[in-house]
Each structure stands twice: as C-alpha cells, then as structure tokens.
C-alpha cells in the first residue's frame, strides 16, 4: 500500500496556520506541531514543565506509523519502566482510534500489526535494551546469555569486599608497599583501619562506571588534572578571568553601596568619613589590580595578588549600611582563600602524583578482578551490561550496522537525565541524523545517578548556534498550572537561574506561559504562599542539629492549612500533596497528621519496615529470647505493650544489683534475693512472675520449633497481633507483623536455620543502613499524598506543599578528601609532612592537609553543579502544582529582611549570594526582598506558635471502617458470638449498677468525679458520647540525667508554699521567698515554681488583695469529710478532701483553690473543675449552714496568672 509522505517545512507551516484558525477547544501550539512533523534531521525538543512532551512524543510516533514506519523500526528509550508502560498504553489507545477512522483495509491491517507489535517493540529503558543486546550477541565477548543481574546491594558488597581484601593484601606486601601505606594513610585521617581508603576506591570505581569506557577514562583522564595543574602557568585562563571578574563585581557592588542614600559619605563638617575613604581605596585597588593584572602580577603573582587583596579588604564578608548587612566581600574571600598558599601547595603537590598513579593502578586492578569474579558467578551489574553492549557495537561493525539500518529513528525521553554511557549507546544506534531527543535541562535532577545535564546543554547550544547539526524546538506553553503558579515560578527563576548556577539562562524563551484561556483566569485566593514558622520564639529549636528534620511546629502549620482547605474550601484530601527532599526524617509529619485525623499515604518509596514500632518490638523480643543478656532488647520487651513494665518498675529492678546484666536483675527480683528486695511490691512481683514464666516458655519453644511458629506463638500468647489491630493504621501494622512471620519462614527455607542466624541477618541489614521493603496494603483513596520531589517528577497535583524549605543542601561531597571531575580527573587533599619546612626537630612529623590545585578546581566545579541541581529540584517541585502552591519553612520574622536585602546583578541575585545560599528558603526570601518593588506573585507569611494550638488548628472528625462497639461483628468464631451474647446480657445489669459495685468506702472528690462521671454527669457533659482519639506512645525508659518536672510534685510544692506564706495585711515578695525555703521539695521542683505569679496574685488581683484585708477570716488547707449516698444502690460512703482555702464571712463564704495545670484557655480548667468545686462548696454549706458561697480558681499554669470565678 502507499503511505502518506513525510512533511516538508512548508507543509508544516500550513498545518500551523490551520490549527491557529481552527475552532478546537484545545489547540496544538506551533512548536508542538513542528516537533511532531519535523523530519530528516536530528531534533532536540526543550520541553518546559507541563508543556505536553509526552503528547508530542506519542503524536510523533503515531504519525510515523501512519506514514508507513513499522513500530519495530523505532528505538524509543524511556527513563523508567513505568514510563515505558504508560507510553505503550497511550500508543495502543491512539492506534485503536486510528483503526476506527481508517478508510482502507490495508491501513487497518498495517495498524493492527503495529498494535500487536507494541509489546515486543524496543520501547523501554536503556538497561532493558542493553540486556537484550548482550543476550543476543554476548557470545562475541564470551558472555553466556544465561546471566543474572546483581540487584541485591548486599550481594554486591560481599563480592566487592572479598576482591578488595585480596587485592589490598597483595599491595601491602608488594614492591611499592611503603608508598601504598602512605597512600592509605593519606585518606585514613585519624582512623586506624583502611575503611576510609576502601570507600575512596569504591567511589572512584563507581564514578568510572558512569563513563562510556571506564578503563579508558581511568587511563587517560583520571590523572589529567594532577599532571596538568602543577605550577602557576598551568592555572586555567578561565579561572584567572573568573577571579578578575569577581574583583570587578565586588568593586562595582561596593561602589553602588556607597552611592546609596543611607550610606554616610560625609561627616557633619562635610569631610569624607573614614569608612568612605577606606571603601574608595578598596574600589580603586580592585579595579586597578584587575585591569592591569598581567602587568602587575601575571599568573606567577597570583599568590601576591591574593595577599594584597587580603590586606586591603576587611576580614569579614559584610558591609553594614543603616543596620543592613550586605555580603559584598563574601565571594572574593571564597575565591582567594586557596590562592594565598599556592606556592607552598605547588611545592608539595608533586609528591602526591606517584601516590595517585598507585591509586590509579589499584582501581584498575580492582575493576578487572571484580569483573572477573562476576564473570565467574555469571552475574553482572547494570553498568557491566551497558559497557558490554557498547563494546559489542564498537568492536563489531556488522552488528552496529544492523541496528543503524533497522532504526528509522532513535528516540529518547527525559534526555536531560542521560549519562555518558547512555549517550554513547544512542550514538552507536543512530546513523547520525535520525535522533529525536525530548527533555528539559531545568528538570535535570539525577546527578547522583551520574546523569550529566551538560550532554543536553551541549546539544542545545550546538543546535542553537548551528541549525545544520540539528533542529532545536522549544516548548514553553504550560498546560498544567493556573497563572498563579506559573507567575510565581517565573518570578523566582528569572532572578535565580542562569548559566553560572542552573546551567541555563532562564530568559523569555524558558519562562512558562499559560497554554489555554482557562489557565489565565485569575484566582487571587490561590496566590502562592511562603509559610514560615516564626523562630523568634524561645520554644522553637533552630539549631543545626535539627535542620534536616521537619519540626513538629512546621507539621502543625501544614496540618492547620490543610484542615482549613478541607473544611472551608471543600478540598478533598486526595487533591493535596506534600513534597519533601528525602524519604527519611518525615516521622514528625506522620505523627502530627495522625494526631489531627488527617489521612496520609506515602509514595511507597520509604523503606522503614524494620523501623516500624511493632516490628521493632518483635525484633527486640526475638533478640531477648536468643540472648537474654542483651540489656537493650530485654528492657524494650519489658517496657513494650506485651508486658507493660513502667519506668518505676524497671528502676526498682535495676537497683537490685549494680553490676549484673538486667536479666539477672530480673531473676533476683523474681526470687526476691536482690539488694533491695523490699522495693519489689506485690504488684510488681506478680508482673515479674508472669514475665518469667512466659519468657521461659518462649525460650524452650524456640529450641524445637520453627521461627514461623515461634513468632505466631508470641502473637497469640500476648495477643500482640490483636493489640496492634486496635491501633491507628491497624491494617499496615498487622500486615507488617504478618510479613515478619513470612520472611522468617522464607529465611529458613533458604537453608538458614535458627533464631540466632535470623537475628544476625536482620542486624546486618540495619548495620549497613539498609531496610526491607515495606508491606503494601490497600491505601485509603481520599488521603493526602506524601512523596519526594524526585518521585513527583512528571506528575501533577492540584494543591502542593513543598516542606522543609529551610533544610540545608547536602554539601558533604565537597568536603571529601577526594573529588572527581569527568573532564579533569581526580583532585585530592594531600597530607604533607612539613616538619623540615618549620625546622621542627623535636616532633617526628608535622602533617598538614592541603587542598591541591586540582582539588580546588574540582571543588568549585562540584559546588556549582550541586547548587545548580538543587535549583532545578526547586523548579521541579514548584511546577507540580495545578491550582495553588505552598512553600513551608521557618525563619526569624524580625531578622530575615535585613539578611536578604541584596544588590541586583543583571536582574539576577549576585552570584556570590547564589553560590553561598544553602537552602530553598534563602533563594526565595532573597528574591522577595531584593526585588520587592516588582510584582513577584508570592506572599511571605509568618506564623507564631500561638496560632498553632489545638484550638486554632482544629480536627478532622475520625471515621472508623467498622463499629468497634459491636463485638459480634468483629469476631469470626460462632462460640465467641454466643458467649458474647450471654455476657452482654449480664453486662447490661452490671453497667446499671457499675458505680455501686465498684464503690469503695472512702473516696476523694477527684475519685468520686471519675467514678460517677458516666452516670451523674457532674460536668454537664455527656462523656459517653465524647470521641477520644488515642495515639500510640511506645518509648524506651529514659535513664539519662535530664529530668522533666513531675506536675504532681510541682502542684504539691505550690500548695505547701501557699500554706507556709505568713499571711498579713501586706504580703511581700520577701515573705514568699522565705516560705519557699521552708518547702519540703527537691531544689529543681522549687526552682520551677514561678513565685512572681504568686506575688502578682497578692499585689494586683482583687481576690488577692481582699484575702489580705480579711486575713483574720482566712482558713487554709482545711480538711473535711462528708457523707454521700450512692443514687443507684442507696449505699452510703464518705468523701474526704482538703480545701486549699476559704474566707468565712458573716453571710457568705469565699472558696478558692490553686491549680498548676498547664492551660491556654482558662475556661477549659473552669469546666474541668466544676464538679470538684461543687463538692467543696457542698461540704462548706453543710458545715456552716451558709447558702451563699463564691468559688474561685487561681490558675498558675498559664503564661499569666488567671483568677476565674466559678458559676
């Protein structure tokens, strides 16, 4: 059959015009049409976020099919397996649609064949394709087609460590042993083992594997920097130019600053100020030295230049004008710090070259021996397979030609995340002019997987400058987000991203534009919000130790806004997504959302199975059974819900003997043979007896039964499986416990038997900071999503919260003793012995670690690459939102503006600032403050802790999937159902007379309140209808020295203090302080009493003053006893108590009571103690036969003292 020909540029222009004039609701853009139909040359499509790149790719493939190109003549590479599956689904749908409209039978037959061929076509990841090549042609390299992939990191580590150990031993005894030892020590620091060196070897090996030819890179590039940058003349010209530019920029910024209105140039007498003269001198010198550099210094004089600059500029980074600090000298300081010592560095740097050659030799030998071991095992890593495939195509012209002839077009999605191995594969498969590449350098966020955005960037610049090499098409219309999201994203990155940081200039060609009229509609309520927790408050810990965690207060801030969206704007939870930087350290979010009833599901990427509480409890149970002398595990088991020992119980057991293991202390307590056996109460003795019998049963059972049976015996004996089933997230918890039993069973089926081996395997996994995959359960549909920014790439969500924007970027790599560059090779910190330099004869050595010049150059390159990737990560996160975007962090409301008021450079934040800022928040606040006169389309709002109380946040009404009170529905056994039916009949009778049945002879007012609350409704509230949401709190006992104050102890001390104060007509602070010394309490408890509040009570409140005036009528700490009658049984009982104080007047009594409870709303305490105060009033009324009794609560537990009158 005859197919339609491919379109030429004129034909494409006609389609673009027709599309523009059509009445389609959603029109294709001219650039999309161009990307779909352009033919005959390489095409690079730079597709901004939400611009429809997948649509373009599918339409282009379909157009190829309709023009007679079979699906198996296309090579289509996707970034993930999931993306490949989605692409196939879309293609199937499109082909089916074309089948329905096809007019000829031949076309229908052809399209049907393509529909069938989709599943076997080359549509998938590069890893999958390279496996296919090696399976088919691996014989040319001697590779068996029946190989397996080494995906288990633990298995990889075992083989690698064995190879490394053997090779290390050989080098330690080889001819260069002395130099090798020096090499190892150079990377070991203060450590006395070679683990640090091993980590460096593995790092170099992994880096080399990301190149298209690891061996060639190691031989030709690895030492390039070390061999090149050996003296001043070898310093790259661009580095010198960069330094001179920084000098010019610093001078210009300082000049702009001195011209500011607030800058004080002259004194009152009209004479230039000392600061102004100093700054003018700095400007003059920096300009002069940079302009006449070659004449004054040259490359050989760089050290002198660095010293001259150091002498003329201040030691600090900032210049302060009108109270605002400007980091004018920060970048210049950073650039000259390494130059000042270059003479010394060059003197010793040469010594490191031989060591690096030795390292090169070691890594090459390791790579070869590791590969040979994998060949013996016939098991390979993905990188091995990729390199095999490249080798096959490079060394076999016929095979390469076969593929090049086969493929009409070589297509790749997410091109910005390609690494050099993948790029080489694409080059080998292409005929040189049939590549179609789709991507967006602004979304390149996989550098940690060795992706190199410069591959995309080089193509972009080449096609932009020379269209004959390929066609560059830019898709900038966004079809995802409302204008509020697009505008705020543009306003941020217009001032942030350029080629220096970000790798591309975010100009008009890259700015996002709404692709439809619907998106251009304005919704002022959806303006992007930066929500910041105000860290001016003392309660918030803003220390570096907490900088990676999302604080509970930040989580509350998010919860508050989500509850508002849900209740006030009817936003379903499933429309809301939280984005975080990493999969770990998100416990604060989970706990906070659980507390406020917000349903939350994670993306499934978190591997925290072994860290889930219920699994940790079981693992500690198994550890204790295996080895009872494991104190940590045993205490955890005792403290767990299985046995319920509290801290007091554990302390009583612990002091039975100081030196013994805890298990022996338990046994001493069991036999009552310890040093303090009198402290073992009958109740505790019963607990210990029960534990010892159960525990010994488990230990005996473990000797003769499988792990699977043991685990289920534990579940059944202590009802632990049922217990977790009553907790929040019950399905997940029970699934985790069930999976533990299954995994133990699978472990024993592999031939490994015994509890000890299973425990060692688990501990090994944890030791290597690994985990087992989480167990999947059916997740709620209407729930907030929590996922990483990386995981969210390519997805879209209506409401997006980007959390923890104040989290610092990880810069750990730039402090490593070894930094690698793809183009310059290795740079190291060299540890030189400078004893002779210092003429030091006493010490055996004076070791100094110095950053070699290759290290300094690589470090700067790596820092910029890291910052660029973080900037692109922020871009990806912000462009996920459809309707509204939130960015959440924490900062000081009073200090932030001064910190970020910068001088603009070419409509961008100064490069110095962008290089030194280390959080998303820094960038956002700096843009907002520096360009505050422009419309930036995002607001900054600070939230205080006072706005994050439970009252302000609110609560989502919890809903249960079943009625927990219906026991019949929650049991399967018919016997249990019948038994429950009988018991419930009895229970109805018992419940009616519950208070009488449980009634003691004597009770306190608080206990009476507790017993009779359900039926007497003392507080005026129907307690039985109150929904109480409980949370699990399983913590190990804290035996540290830090101690929180016991509220009961504090309350008792306050009451004693109030009794001891010598009352008079004028109580002074001295009287209160004197009384405090007489209080019988610990020093820490007395220190916690806020005597200022008590003094305020007597000096400022009406009640306090009146008590002093009527001091002769005052009664304090008055005991009473009162006979009461049970309304159900008619039995009489006695209520006893002590009244804090009252004034006995002629015709009335004024009753008052001190309360130290913490509170925010005093009305809550008023409601809580209504019943207790009523009992006190009743006792006084009966004693004195006075009807009028005024009741007051004196509340000491709030920020301020409150006196509340009771009804």
Swiss-Prot record:
Molecular function via GO: 3'-5' DNA helicase activity; 3'-5' exonuclease activity; ATP binding; ATP hydrolysis activity; double-stranded DNA binding
Co-factor(s): Mg(2+)
Keyword terms: ATP-binding, DNA damage, DNA repair, DNA-binding, Exonuclease, Helicase, Hydrolase, Isomerase, Nuclease, Nucleotide-binding
Domain UvrD-like helicase ATP-binding positions: 26-482
UniProt name for this protein: ATP-dependent helicase/nuclease subunit A
Residue span(s) of domain UvrD-like helicase C-terminal: 508-794
NCBIfam families per the UniProt record, alphabetical: addA_Gpos (TIGR02785)
Subunit structure as annotated in this protein's UniProt entry: Heterodimer of AddA and AddB/RexB.
Reactions the enzyme catalyzes: Couples ATP hydrolysis with the unwinding of duplex DNA by translocating in the 3'-5' direction; ATP + H2O = ADP + phosphate + H(+)
E.C. no: 3.1.-.-, 5.6.2.4
Gene Ontology terms: cellular component: cytosol; DNA helicase complex
Top-level taxon in the UniProt lineage: Bacteria
A Pfam family of this chain: PDDEXK_1
InterPro entries: AddA, DNA_helicase_UvrD-like_C, DNA_helicase_UvrD/REP, P-loop_NTPase, PDDEXK-like_dom_sf, PDDEXK_AddAB-type, Restrct_endonuc-II-like, UvrD-like_ATP-bd
The gene coding this protein: addA
Gene3D superfamilies tied to this protein: 3.90.320.10, P-loop containing nucleotide triphosphate hydrolases, PCRA, domain 4
Family membership noted in the UniProt record: Belongs to the helicase family. AddA subfamily.
Protein residues bound to ATP: 47-54
SUPFAM superfamilies: P-loop containing nucleoside triphosphate hydrolases (SSF52540), Restriction endonuclease-like (SSF52980)
Coiled coil: none
Record-level GO BP terms: double-strand break repair via homologous recombination
Purpose of the protein: The heterodimer acts as both an ATP-dependent DNA helicase and an ATP-dependent, dual-direction single-stranded exonuclease. Recognizes the chi site generating a DNA molecule suitable for the initiation of homologous recombination. The AddA nuclease domain is required for chi fragment generation; this subunit has the helicase and 3' -> 5' nuclease activities.
